Regions:
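A broad detector of the eukaryotic-type serine/threonine protein kinase catalytic domain
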Residues: 22-23, 58, 95, 118
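Active-site loop/turn elements of alpha/beta-hydrolase fold enzymes
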Residues: 20, 55-56, 149
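Active-site neighborhood of HAD-like aspartate-dependent phosphohydrolases
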Residues: 1-51
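Acidic active-site catalytic centers that drive phospho-/nucleotidyl reactions
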Residues: 12-14, 55, 129, 133
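Substrate-recognition element of Asp-dependent hydrolases with the DxDx(T/V) motif
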Residues: 36, 40-73, 85-98, 137
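Conserved protein kinase catalytic core
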Residues: 18-20, 25, 61, 135, ...
Length: 177
């Protein structure tokens, strides 16, 4: 029997789920953004898979390592677990702009997530605070949604400029599959 495919919402990590503090390697620095729990709860209630897609060039530049990235992700998991929530997949690019296929806006990590999970792009979206997030959405044929981050947005015109992650998720759910 073929598994039922779930639509995915691809989420940037820094500036979208948590405060962007530069090259965060200390789990104690994790601060969930204000509407994250409500947004993830709404996605779960509507059976969307949540997949984090993140550029972590601090690894290539020596400011971070895989252990630190995993420890920050684990702290996010711990905090969400306290609210009965989970992230379905964590993917990050450890490279610095070296032509790889996994650094956003390249679609390599989205394609990997699609292979590793029973996901569909029908009804899917990409949410992030940078132009590379919106461009990634475009490259895989899904809406790219911009949420405010610590830096002015520079990039292609998003399908939606949302004031919060929750507003972005409400738009996705209203659009349906």
């Amino acid at each position: 029997m073929t598994p039922r495919l779930r639509p995915a919402v691809f989420l940037d990590r820094d500036g979208t789920l948590i405060e962007d503090k530069g090259f965060l390697g200390d789990p104690a620095g994790v601060e969930l953004l204000p509407t994250v729990v409500d947004a993830l709860r709404l996605l779960a209630a509507n059976d969307y898979a949540t997949i984090v897609i993140s550029n972590q060039s601090g690894i290539a530049s020596g400011l971070l390592d895989e252990v630190k990235v995993r420890s920050v992700n684990a702290e996010i998991v711990r905090r969400l677990d306290g609210d009965g929530l989970a992230i379905d997949g964590w993917y990050w690019c450890p490279h610095y702009d070296d032509g790889c296929d996994c650094r956003k806006p390249e679609p390599g990590l989205v394609h990997r997530a699609l292979r590793e999970h029973a996901l569909t792009l029908t009804g899917a979206a990409m949410i992030g605070d940078r132009g590379s997030d919106v461009e990634l959405g475009r490259r895989v044929g899904i809406p790219g949604i911009a949420v405010p981050g610590p830096f002015p947005y520079v990039g292609p015109e998003p399908d939606l400029r949302a004031a919060t992650l929750l507003e972005a998720v409400e738009w996705i759910v209203r659009r349906g599959r």
